[in-house]
């Protein structure tokens, strides 16, 4: 892979001051600088957010919407960035079921070793079983010498004559009988004697590299044929293999990888169901035996009253046949036990609500038992008590020894050890063990190499002491981050930008060098690594240093240096460089007198501690250090801290003693971060805000105006800005950066509060101050000053006092927490325990921390720190070191002395500490080595066997344009989408927590492939089927609507939909101004109405607690604590009763703000002679006082209830019945006949009254225009047929009679925008969203160039970028409000293309489905250029190419074949296929024919009906007065560029004219067939037999068989779609999706019906040895031969055979077919079953999805239709199909407004005479066959 520059400019995130950075891909970039300088803002808030959001936006909506919570970074331009992954501390906090072994794939590698070489054993006797897995058999055969001839044999299970005939029909030619090979035909008449030992020869081949795929296919066929048995003959040596063994009625099969996963269904422990934990009930009262499950008899079980648990429990009750309402004591012990502890392989079908689908969906849940579910949570948590009720206890499962594995897996061994024993070994011991393992097998060596590599990563990262079964949730933050790094290294993803957050945290200095090596490996895999680091040693790791500073917060945010590390050390003058050069150092304090008081801790044995006793000095700074895993946390956090807590509770722990001293208080400052929200600020955290608010409330003006302390809190409604609720910012949508509130300009408060000053500053000014400024400002207020000084003492002086805690870095949060504790220091001698307090701190900040910690010891307190940072260790008064290693080798006390004494010892810390004390610390050595190139830049696919693929291996070069060619159904789609796309999605999704990745994996089943390596994140661009077409507009599909809605929400000005006047804003201040103007000196009562539907008693109780005391109703006031009358009218909470006067304006403002905080509407009562009520709502109003809501993003979106049009529900279109438009269709009916057609049982009198009796009985065509309109539209006595039919449609939406009369028409209310009136009247520069949606992209670009503010710059920039890509794919002409489902195939595909490429990322693997098919030749260069640009931008493009048109432009081509279906799926040599070499810029293609056979076209006889034509004069959309005619009984082709109007001509022109002629009966054709381009819509249930209506005849035949009659089986019982016939467990699907929570879905054949879909009883009926389920698996060609006597099915079967689909099973699911196969099916259905009556076929781009082989015979077939008396008009872009027509119509010359004109009409051979034609240069000039 080549290294490319990455540019990021104009970064304004948080404190970054419009900075720009650059670096190269595949570099290690180290971001450094003082804490709070802006490093995390660049790394995480800019680079990570941008890379992640851009890639996620291309994923399916259900996944993308789950994880787009990151705000868009404020940045001007990003170029060259690849998809990003952030690895932070606590990286796996959401991975509830993960262990070290499962996450790093150690267990999956070990399971594979057990599968291939493990010894299966009998669980009872432990005796070895002689079994082979498929992989083991293959591995054994692969060890044979190259070039040896081998025969693969399978035992012959049946030897009778009928069986021999059947084998011969299947293509087998030889058998091996008693050691000798014989031709199979020699036994056709006699059969084979029973006493002969016979094998059938599956295949004979030479073992070579070229034959591996064939070898795999033949071997697996042999095992399937021999039901688990086969043999291999080579050089007269016979090797026999068996995959089954039966002992005591138990059949044992070979070991599989799934057996060694506690999450797999069959392999889990039968007692704990895979959790490894046994939960015992110690208190029997936890279960109330008198209650039922429905009544929640088990207090620890999920609540049955919830929908989720009730559904699951009901499914359990149905499966076990018991009632949920039965008391527990009356349930059988077996059911009780299953409820509590589950049952093996118990899978429940449940219908749960699926949020991604928006409906209930059938899924299958494994029932493990409620106790085992609890055990599962306990197994993976650090706080088991959270899940254990009192009276319950958790123990390791006695049956599986805590592994969760079943007994068969538990006793299996490999290299003398069980899987359980491996799980309990440390990673160091694993490494020692596996380094000794030798294997002659190449495949085993490869697995061992991968496993050893992962172990090396983990050990190099200092994690060797961990055991692989350690739950990730129990690891420290640093351990989790380093485990994540190892996981990513093992995953071998390419092209990722990894962003690491201080990976050296928690790492001892001796392990840092190993960490450096591991991170370099991550880079050398082809990734970019961004490090946020402070560790000096990490400087030697970086390829580039970016130093941010110079200070922190507002004093930072600038790029001080960007370049090579050596230049940084030599030339930079920043604090970081000075500390590295030791120009600045942290001094070691002078030695103190010997301590006089000590703390003694004895008998420390928890975890790996070796019975330690320690002695710690009091009133000193003590450092506890040691290598990772040595026992520091166990000693301090798990032993010392609990002992101190017990001592302070006066429980006198035996292991704690004091010598001449004591501890009176414990402060344990952990690394757990405090709650962070936008409403928490530093002032609130250190408790200084209360004092400041009291100070402002005590000012004279505050006292005069009645402003209290609450008014100065932005979290209280009294003073907070009503618009932003006190936040100071407004968020347009979740993924946008907040913008300053337009009402308070970011000040958080309303104006009256801001008028209160103290020393010239208001409360907002105080919040804007830094701690440095505030410390000086409040110098005269000791209480406030002391608290702010605590921040400054910890170098947080730069921090704005009002900055939300949610925006602080990790280092800032740690110091803020410490400042909080320092403020509340006690006179009691306190022990402060800190766990790595230097986390996130720069060396400069560490110095301040040390000063604070030492000051505490000078006050007599004791400070104990767990620390690896040598700057801290060197200044400690006393040091404890644990070691010497981690895990079992740790837990010893190596040193207990002063730092100076420590460096005299030979310990790991002593070696690291010595240079710091002696002042001999060297500047890190910088090795300017270029990154080593990855070993392989290829995407490697091994053993791909999805669908038709024949276990192929291949390598695809990265950063190339790759074409995958081959016939239809040869495996192209399976390879590109089912394997590459699925593998890439799963690999990328697995880098996220399970709660996120679960959504994507739901839609991504595990691919059938051995291994895929070298993938980058993938993006697919597929053809959309009709069922997947969106009703959204172009603007919505491309993300333009979202940006425009945000833009109008910020800049839009509302106008009245009624008067079009500009609206004025209603705010609390405008309400007060109105009151002062109209009711000055009157008294008012300000109230908040009680919400309708509220429980009045409960509501009032809550309000009483909040301090409200009065209720208002009908002019009366009531105390809330008194008895209230019933049936109160308009009750409202009283906020305030006051006089309207300027003096009271602030109290009025406060009261109104409080009222609005309680409800969206407030009522103000004016106390006059006649009391008057005023109602107000915030928002906008017109001059007459009509109220309108606030302008929000939701209000401007048709996807939200607030914004959508009520008439059309936001769709922009309505269904309409207008009989006036269909008069010709219904002209022959009388009014009474037409009425009774829809309402046969209704009363006819209204129709007769409406029309004269004689007219009601006449045909509609004889009515006058007025009478016909009355009949359609109605009168006062009769609503009209239009209205009646619309009412009928509401109750019978699928009525076949009404559907032809329906038409979609633009909604008159919203004019097609989908927005309500108000939203359509929000304008910018007098332009509304409706105006924009009615224009094209060019108009929008011009509009955007006229507007813009600082707040909207990023939105406008994003919109302009999207418009650029719309232009690139040639769609600028399309109206933005046009619906997506109205686009042509080519337009729709380019729409998806524009969306996917607009992310502008690098290192993506783009997967395209036929990018050049269905395009006009003129558009081909545009798309090819786009694909090449993607490659030039360092991406990989892989595209299927059935037409071979991309191959000439590809860098690499793969050919699959040689045939379709079972005959395809092999990897072919490139020289076996001849493909066209197309010059996209030449007049004539260089090679015209692919495949080789030339098209043979016989011209139709034009004399018959040659004078009959179909004429149209069309005006619609951009087409005006287009006059064109098409001859009938001829092949008529329509060509033209996309968007020129071809489909409009076909459907709005020729189709409607044909319907009119048919209605009049004045045409030579009597039927009309319209065929669109969409592949046939498919569901999980539809198959070929149902689509062609073959299944009913076959079902009827089976039902007529004697056996069916004897069993009383009707034809419906052979249907997979009826309850009587379908298998009840899989609902007739033949398979089950096993929901494995956050693992990819597993598809398994249904065990009940064995995948045959029909119920077992129906499988008893056989015909020629096959039941109906087996018949559905039979190829079409075989069905045609077997059932020639069923006449009804011969026509569809012949059509399928003629088009070349005979290889497909008759019951093949339509959803499983390739696009080419689906199109071929549709073609066969409509065109190969010739209708009996003369028919006009209108075909809209159907043929573009056919492969060349099927397309070769298409002109001949179309010609046969013409010769049979039919007419064909088709749209296509294929030049060969266009020139094969009798008559060609070309529309153009451009798209949209530039199209719609007739360029040519006539014979294709005359096109060269045309001056206007664009097609003529593509059509061959040779003479067409006559």
UniProtKB/Swiss-Prot annotation:
Coiled-coil residue windows: none
Primary localisation category: cytoplasm
Biological-process GO terms, alphabetical: nucleotide-excision repair; SOS response
Residues annotated for ATP 2 binding in this entry: 626-633
CDD domains: ABC_UvrA, ABC_UvrA_II
Gene3D superfamilies referenced in this protein's UniProt entry, alphabetically: 3.30.190.20, ABC transporter ATPase domain-like, ABC transporter ATPase like domain, ATP-grasp fold, A domain, P-loop containing nucleotide triphosphate hydrolases
GO molecular function, one term: DNA binding
SUPFAM superfamilies, per database record: P-loop containing nucleoside triphosphate hydrolases (SSF52540)
Chain sites annotated for binding ATP 1: 33-40
Residues of the ABC transporter domain: 1-581, 594-909, 1503-1814
Binding annotation for ATP 4: 1536-1543
Entry-linked PROSITE patterns: ABC_TRANSPORTER_2
Zn finger limits (C4-type): 721-744, 1623-1649
Subunit comment: Forms a heterotetramer with UvrB during the search for lesions.
Family label: Belongs to the ABC transporter superfamily. UvrA family.
Protein name in UniProt: UvrABC system protein A
Gene field: uvrA
């Amino acid at each position: 892979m080549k290294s490319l520059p990455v540019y990021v400019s104009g970064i304004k995130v948080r404190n970054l001051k419009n900075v720009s950075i650059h670096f190269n891909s595949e570099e290690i970039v180290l971001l450094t600088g003082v804490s709070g300088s802006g490093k995390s803002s660049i790394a995480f808030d800019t680079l990570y957010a941008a890379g992640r959001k851009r890639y996620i936006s291309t994923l399916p909506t259900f996944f993308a919407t789950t994880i787009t919570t990151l705000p868009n970074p404020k940045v001007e331009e990003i170029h060259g960035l690849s998809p990003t992954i952030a690895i932070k501390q606590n990286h796996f906090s959401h991975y509830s079921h993960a262990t070290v072994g499962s996450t790093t794939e150690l267990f999956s590698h070990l399971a594979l070793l057990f599968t291939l070489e493990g010894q299966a054993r009998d669980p009872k006797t432990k005796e070895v079983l002689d079994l082979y897995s498929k992989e083991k058999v293959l591995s054994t055969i692969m060890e044979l010498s190259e070039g040896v001839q081998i025969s693969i044999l399978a035992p012959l299970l049946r030897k009778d004559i009928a069986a021999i005939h059947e084998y011969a029909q299947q293509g087998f030619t030889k058998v091996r009988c008693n050691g000798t090979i014989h031709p199979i035909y020699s036994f056709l008449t006699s059969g084979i004697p029973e006493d002969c030992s016979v094998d059938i020869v599956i295949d004979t081949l030479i073992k070579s590299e070229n034959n591996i795929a064939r070898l795999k296919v033949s071997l697996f066929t042999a095992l399937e044929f021999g039901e688990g048995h086969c043999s291999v003959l080579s050089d007269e040596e016979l090797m026999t293999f068996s995959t089954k063994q039966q002992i005591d009625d138990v059949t044992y099969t070979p070991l599989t990888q799934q057996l060694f996963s506690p999450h797999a269904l069959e392999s889990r422990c039968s007692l704990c169901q895979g959790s490894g934990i046994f939960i015992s009930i110690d208190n029997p009262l936890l279960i109330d035996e008198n209650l039922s499950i429905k009544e929640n008899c088990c207090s620890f079980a999920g609540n049955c009253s919830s929908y989720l648990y009730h559904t699951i429990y009901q499914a359990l009750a149905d499966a076990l046949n018991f009632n949920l309402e039965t008391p527990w004591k009356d349930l059988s012990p077996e059911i009780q036990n299953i409820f509590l502890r589950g049952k093996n392989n118990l899978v429940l079908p449940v219908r749960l609500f699926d949020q991604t689908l928006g409906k209930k969906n059938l899924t299958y849940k494994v029932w493990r038992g409620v106790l085992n579910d609890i055990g599962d949570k306990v197994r993976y948590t650090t706080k088991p008590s959270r899940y254990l009720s009192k009276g319950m206890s958790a123990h390791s499962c006695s049956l599986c020894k805590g592994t969760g594995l079943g007994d068969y897996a538990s006793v299996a061994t490999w290299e003398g050890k069980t899987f359980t024993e491996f799980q309990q070994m440390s990673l160091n011991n694993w490494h020692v063990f596996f380094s000794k393992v030798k294997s002659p097998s190449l495949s085993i060596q490869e697995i061992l190499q991968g496993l050893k590599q992962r172990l090396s990563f983990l050990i190099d990262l200092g994690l060797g002491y961990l055991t692989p079964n350690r739950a990730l949730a129990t690891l420290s933050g640093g351990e989790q981050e380093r485990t994540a790094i190892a996981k990513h290294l093992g995953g071998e993803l390419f092209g990722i930008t990894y962003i690491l957050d201080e990976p050296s945290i928690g790492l001892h200095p001796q392990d840092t060098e190993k960490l450096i090596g591991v991170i370099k490996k991550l880079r050398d895999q082809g990734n970019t690594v961004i490090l946020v680091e402070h560790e000096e040693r990490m400087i030697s790791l970086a390829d580039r240093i970016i130093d941010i500073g110079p200070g922190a917060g507002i004093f930072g945010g600038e790029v001080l240096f960007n370049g090579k590390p050596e230049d940084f050390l030599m030339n930079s003058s920043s604090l970081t460089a000075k500390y590295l050069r030791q120009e600045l150092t942290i001094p070691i304090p002078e030695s103190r007198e010997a301590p006089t008081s000590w703390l003694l801790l004895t008998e420390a044995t928890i975890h790996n501690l070796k019975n330690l006793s320690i002695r710690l000095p009091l009133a000193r700074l003590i450092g506890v250090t040691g290598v990772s895993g040595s026992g520091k946390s166990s000693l301090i956090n798990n032993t010392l801290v609990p002992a101190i807590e017990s001592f302070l509770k006066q429980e006198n722990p035996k292991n704690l003693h004091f010598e001449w001293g004591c501890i009176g208080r414990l402060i344990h400052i952990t690394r757990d971060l405090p709650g962070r929200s936008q409403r928490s600020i530093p002032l609130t955290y250190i408790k200084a805000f209360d004092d400041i608010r009291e100070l402002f409330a005590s000012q004279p003006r505050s006292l005069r105006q009645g402003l209290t302390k609450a008014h100065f809190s932005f979290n209280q409604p009294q003073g907070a800005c009503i618009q932003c609720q006190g936040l100071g910012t407004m968020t347009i949508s979740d993924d946008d950066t907040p913008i300053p509130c337009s009402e308070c300009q970011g000040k958080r408060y309303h104006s009256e509060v801001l008028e209160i000053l103290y020393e010239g500053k208001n409360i907002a000014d105080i919040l804007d101050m830094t701690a440095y400024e505030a410390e000086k400002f409040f110098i005269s207020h000791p209480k406030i000053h002391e608290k702010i000084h605590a921040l400054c003492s910890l170098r947080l002086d730069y921090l704005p006092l009002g900055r939300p805690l949610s925006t602080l870095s990790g280092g800032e949060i740690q110091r803020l927490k410490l400042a909080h504790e320092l403020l509340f220091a006690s006179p009691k001698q306190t022990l402060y325990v800190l766990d790595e307090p230097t986390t996130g701190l720069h060396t400069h900040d560490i110095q301040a921390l040390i000063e604070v910690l030492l000051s505490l010891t000078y006050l007599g307190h004791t400070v104990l720190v767990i620390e690896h940072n040598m700057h801290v260790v060197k200044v400690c008064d006393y040091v404890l070191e644990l070691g010497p290693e981690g895990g079992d080798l740790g837990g010893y006390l190596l040193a207990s002395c002063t730092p100076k004494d420590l460096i005299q010892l030979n310990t790991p810390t002593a070696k690291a500490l010595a240079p710091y004390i002696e002042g001999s610390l060297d500047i890190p050595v910088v090795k300017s080595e270029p990154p080593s190139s990855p070993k392989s830049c290829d995407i490697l696919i091994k053993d791909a066997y999805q669908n038709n693929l024949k276990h192929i291996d291949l390598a695809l070069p990265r950063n190339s344009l790759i074409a995958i060619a081959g016939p239809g159904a040869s495996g192209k789609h399976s390879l590109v989408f089912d394997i590459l796309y699925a593998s890439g999605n799963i690999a990328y999704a697995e880098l996220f927590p399970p709660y996120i990745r679960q959504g994507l994996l739901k839609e991504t089943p595990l691919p059938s492939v051995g291994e895929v390596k070298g993938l980058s994140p993938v993006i697919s661009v597929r053809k959309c089927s009709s069922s997947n077409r969106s009703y959204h507009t172009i603007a919505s599909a491309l993300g333009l609507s979202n940006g425009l809605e945000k833009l109008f929400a910020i800049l839009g000005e509302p106008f009245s939909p009624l008067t079009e006047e500009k609206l004025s804003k209603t705010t609390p201040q405008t309400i007060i101004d109105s009151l002062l103007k109209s009711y000055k000196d009157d008294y008012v009562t300000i109230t908040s109405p009680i919400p309708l539907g509220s429980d009045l008693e409960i509501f009032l109780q809550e309000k009483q607690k909040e301090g409200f005391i009065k209720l208002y109703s009908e002019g009366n006031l009531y105390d809330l604590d008194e008895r209230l009358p019933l049936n109160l009218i308009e009750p409202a909470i009283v906020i305030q009763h006051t006089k309207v006067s300027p003096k009271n304006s602030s109290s009025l403002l406060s009261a109104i703000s409080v009222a609005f905080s309680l409800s969206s509407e407030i009522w103000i009562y004016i106390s006059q002679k006649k009391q008057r009520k005023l109602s107000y709502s915030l928002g906008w109003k017109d001059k007459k006082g009509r109220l309108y809501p606030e302008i929000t993003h939701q209000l401007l979106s048709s996807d939200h209830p607030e914004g959508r049009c009520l008439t059309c529900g936001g769709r922009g279109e309505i269904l309409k019945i207008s009989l006036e438009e269909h008069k010709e269709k219904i002209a022959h009916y009388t009014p009474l006949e037409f009425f009774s057609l829809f309402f046969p049982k209704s009363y006819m009198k209204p129709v007769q009254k409406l029309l004269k009796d004689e007219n009601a009985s006449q045909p509609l065509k004889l009515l006058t225009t007025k009478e016909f309109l009355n009949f359609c539209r109605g009168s006062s006595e009769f609503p009209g047929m239009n209205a009646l039919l619309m009412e009928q449609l509401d109750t019978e939406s699928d009525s076949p009679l009404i559907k032809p009369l329906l038409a979609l028409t633009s909604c008159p209310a919203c004019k097609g925008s989908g927005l309500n009136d108000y939203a359509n009247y929000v304008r910018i520069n007098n332009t509304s969203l409706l105006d924009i949606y009615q224009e094209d992209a060019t108009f929008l670009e011009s509009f955007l160039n006229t507007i813009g503010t600082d707040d909207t710059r990023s939105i406008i920039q994003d919109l302009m970028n999207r418009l650029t890509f719309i232009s690139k794919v040639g769609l600028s002409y399309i109206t933005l409000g046009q619906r997506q489902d109205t686009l042509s195939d080519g337009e729709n595909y380019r729409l998806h293309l524009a969306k996917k490429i607009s992310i502008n990322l690098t290192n993506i693997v783009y997967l395209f489905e036929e990018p050049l098919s269905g395009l006009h030749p003129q558009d081909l260069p545009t798309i090819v250029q786009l694909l090449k640009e993607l490659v030039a931008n360092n991406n990989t493009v892989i595209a299927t190419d059935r037409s071979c048109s991309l191959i000439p432009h590809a860098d690499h081509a793969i050919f699959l074949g040689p045939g379709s279906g079972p005959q395809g799926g092999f990897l072919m040599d490139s020289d076996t296929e001849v493909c066209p070499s197309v010059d996209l810029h030449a007049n004539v293609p260089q090679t015209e024919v692919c495949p080789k056979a030339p098209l043979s076209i016989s011209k139709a006889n034009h004399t018959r009906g040659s004078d009959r034509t179909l004429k149209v004069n069309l005006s619609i959309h951009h087409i005006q007065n287009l006059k064109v005619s098409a001859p009938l009984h001829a092949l008529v082709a329509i060509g033209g560029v996309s968007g020129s109007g071809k489909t409009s001509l076909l459907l709005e022109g020729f189709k409607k004219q044909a319907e009119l002629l048919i209605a009049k009966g004045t045409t030579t054709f009597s039927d009309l067939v319209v065929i669109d381009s969409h592949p046939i819509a498919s569901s999980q249930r539809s198959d070929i037999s149902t689509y062609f209506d073959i299944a009913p005849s076959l079902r009827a035949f089976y039902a007529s068989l004697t056996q069916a009659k004897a069993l009383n089986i009707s034809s419906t019982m052979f249907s997979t779609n009826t309850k009587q016939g379908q298998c009840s467990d899989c609902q007739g699907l033949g398979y089950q999706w096993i929901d494995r929570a956050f693992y990819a879905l597993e598809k398994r054949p249904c065990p009940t019906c064995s995948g045959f879909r029909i119920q077992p009883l129906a499988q008893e009926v056989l015909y020629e040895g096959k039941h109906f389920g087996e018949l559905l698996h039979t190829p079409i060609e075989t069905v045609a031969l077997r059932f020639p006597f069923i006449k009804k099915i011969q026509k569809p079967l012949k059509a399928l055979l003629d088009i070349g689909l005979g290889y497909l099973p008759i019951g093949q699911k339509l959803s499983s077919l390739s696009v080419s196969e689906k199109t071929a099916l549709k073609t066969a259905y409509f065109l190969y079953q010739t209708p009996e009556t003369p028919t006009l076929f209108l075909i809209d781009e159907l043929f573009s999805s056919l492969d060349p082989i099927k397309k070769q015979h298409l002109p001949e077939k179309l010609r046969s239709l013409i010769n049979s008396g039919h007419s064909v008009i088709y749209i296509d872009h294929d030049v060969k199909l266009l020139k094969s027509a009798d008559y060609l119509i070309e529309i153009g010359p451009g798209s949209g407004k530039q199209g719609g004109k007739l360029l040519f009409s006539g014979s294709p051979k005359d096109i060269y005479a045309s001056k206007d034609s664009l097609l003529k240069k593509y059509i061959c000039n040779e003479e067409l066959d006559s």
